[in-house]
């Protein structure tokens, strides 16, 4: 009797080599997928860490850019526009370049220094009309030495003392005092409250030599109080731009302005940049000269946190 074959009788089971290759392929695909997932997680975590580090650096710098005692290298570019003045119909303007140069402790001078020259191009009113004159103003410079009292750090205080100078570089008599000046300078900073910085800068240049016979002797205190408050993500508000001028000589101008502004620390192609805008209003003035009524200020600061001379 002939035996009838069934389809199952002709089926062949895969050999051991085929099963091994199949398992190896599944294993390789699983490893590849796991590696891709892990790489994606690592990249996301690295991106979050970089973003967090950048944000922390921006928040820290938003305090230091306004601190006259901070060892922070900057190149500041300012524009001050005054549309209204007391005792004049003229609109005035000041373009200002102000590098800040910290110097580390050196063998011959074992203290930290902060040098800040200020160069101005000023458009100044010549009288009660609308006429103005534009030219270089006197160059100002201060050289501060950081305090070496470590116990002050426990109180979140930092201060510096030094000397201020004024050089008679003005190209027009309306833009300068016509006098060589030198005097004391000091700065103080307090950062004991989270996100808040409070400080002041005081200078008092006194004239000792003159470039013209009719120059008026100078003895003026420049008092610059201020505060800044960090808002996060590099944003901050501040009142640090107003300089009170208190003249010790009888009959010379005394002015007390107030200001308020907002700024942002950001990173552009690896370069830390501070941009800000503020408004200033004259709160008190005792003067017979042309004095700003209100002023709009713009600032662009290039920040170099890693660069300190001598390090």
Describe the role of every protein-language-model region.
Residues 1-58, 308-311:
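Cleavable N-terminal export/targeting peptides
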Residues 44-311:
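Transmembrane beta-barrel domains of Gram-negative outer membranes and organellar outer membranes
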């Amino acid at each position: 009797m002939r035996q009838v074959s069934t389809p199952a009788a002709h089926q062949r089971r895969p050999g051991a080599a085929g099963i091994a290759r199949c398992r190896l392929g599944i294993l390789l695909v699983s490893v590849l997928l796991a590696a891709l997932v892990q790489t994606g997680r690592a990249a996301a975590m690295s991106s979050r860490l970089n973003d967090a580090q950048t944000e922390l650096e921006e928040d820290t710098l938003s305090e230091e850019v306004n601190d006259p005692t901070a060892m922070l290298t900057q190149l500041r570019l300012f524009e001050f526009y005054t549309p209204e003045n007391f005792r004049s119909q003229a609109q005035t303007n000041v373009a200002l370049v102000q590098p800040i140069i910290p110097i580390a402790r050196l063998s011959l001078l074992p203290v930290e220094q902060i040098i800040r020259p200020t160069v101005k191009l000023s458009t100044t009113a010549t009288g009660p009309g609308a006429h103005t004159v534009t030219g270089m103003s006197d160059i100002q410079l201060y050289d501060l030495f950081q305090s070496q009292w470590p116990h002050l750090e426990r109180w979140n205080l930092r201060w510096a003392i030094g000397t201020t100078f004024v050089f008679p570089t003005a190209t027009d008599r309306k833009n300068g005092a016509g006098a060589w000046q030198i005097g004391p300078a000091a700065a103080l900073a307090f950062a004991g409250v989270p996100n808040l910085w409070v400080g002041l800068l005081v200078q008092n240049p006194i004239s000792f030599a003159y470039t013209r016979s009719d120059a008026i002797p100078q003895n003026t205190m420049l008092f610059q109080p201020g505060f800044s408050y960090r808002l996060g993500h590099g944003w901050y508000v501040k009142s640090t731009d107003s300089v009170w001028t208190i003249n010790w000589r009888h009959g010379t101008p005394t002015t007390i302005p107030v200001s308020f502004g907002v700024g942002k620390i950001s990173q552009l192609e690896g370069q830390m940049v501070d941009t800000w805008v503020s408004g200033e209003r004259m709160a008190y003035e005792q003067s017979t000269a042309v004095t700003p009524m209100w002023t709009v200020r713009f600032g662009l600061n290039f920040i170099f946190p890693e660069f300190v001379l001598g390090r």
